Structure formats: C-alpha cells, structure tokens
Amino acid sequence: GTTDTPYLGCRRNYHIMMTDGRWNSSPSGGQHDGVNSLTLPDGTVYADGTATQIAKTRVFRDTISDTLADWAFRSWSDPLQVATSLTGSLQPTVDYLKAPATENFGNDSAGNPAVLDRYWNPRYNPASWPHMVTYTIGASNDATTWPGASTISGPTAKVPFGYDGSFPDFVTGNRNWPDMVGGGEPVRALDLWHAAINGRGRFYAVN
C-alpha cells in the first residue's frame, strides 16, 4: 500500500458565517466559553476556577450553553487535528507577535479601565495549534439592534465592529453577554459579535 501525505500543520482555517442577523432555531452544542476548567493546547490556562483567571477572560465568557459563541470558542480552542499527525506547525500571527503586552480600551460605563493582556485580547490570535478562526457577517439592520438588551451599545465602527461601545464593559465584567437562548431573537444579534470575539475574527454588520 501507499502512505498518505501528512496534512500541513501550518495551514490556517477560517469560517465565514453570514446571516440576516438573528438565528431562530434550537441549537444544541453545549457550554464551552463559560467553563471553570480548561487548559489550551499551548499550556495556557483559560479557566481554573479562580477569580483572577476569570477576570482576564470575561470578554469571552457567558453562562449560557448552545450559542454561536460557544461553537466559535470550541472551534478556536480545541485542536482540529492531533499535532503528531501533521507535518510542520502553526505559528501565532504576525500581528500578535508585534502587539503590545497590554492594551487599554478606555473606561467602561462605570469608569473602570478596560485593560487586556495581549494573549486575551480578541484583536489578536495567539493560537499555535490547528484551529478555526470565525468571522461573522450580519446583513441587515437586525444585525446592529438588540431591543432585548438595551443597556448594551454597539461600537462606532460597524464594518467591522470596533472596540468601543459596550466592549470595555464586557472586558471588565460591568456588562455580561445576555441569554441568547432564553432571550429570544431580540438579543441574538449580539451572538454574532460574541462569536467573532470568541473565534478571534471580526464581526461585519452591513446593510
């Protein structure tokens, strides 16, 4: 017989999801971004149950299962293939390697500074394992409105979403991602924003 050529470990993988703004099905995918115990493939601890570690990763977290954000986080954090079955390896992006050690996104709505370490800054992608990066596109006005979560404001820039508005509040924990399942369609456009953050991609809201 013949031996198959190993897959290249340096390949980058992307998922681009487009919708009119709000999903209306009954998904079942589990809880992945709000777990209390998780070590990423490079040895970095995402969750160990301590308040200190939770504080570093608040922008990614919620307490709701079965969301797009859960799927995006799992696709990013869980290796797509076993590293030993690949030839070569993936390196973090150049943008990540050149990024500052910390970034201050200004103050949240309560006046608290929103500061993220480079590794936990969704602007950059530190992953060095086979993973999926998720980009989301919301193609209607519904993608930028969430009447069920009136305390959350979108960023100034929409194409792609920027890092002001309520983003600093998500960083500090002054705001939490709403219940995308129980809250129904009035809040689900926010799942597109959350999924892009969890998947280390960007959210584009276009009309």
What are these regions (language model features)?
Residues 1-207:
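P/S/T/G-enriched low-complexity
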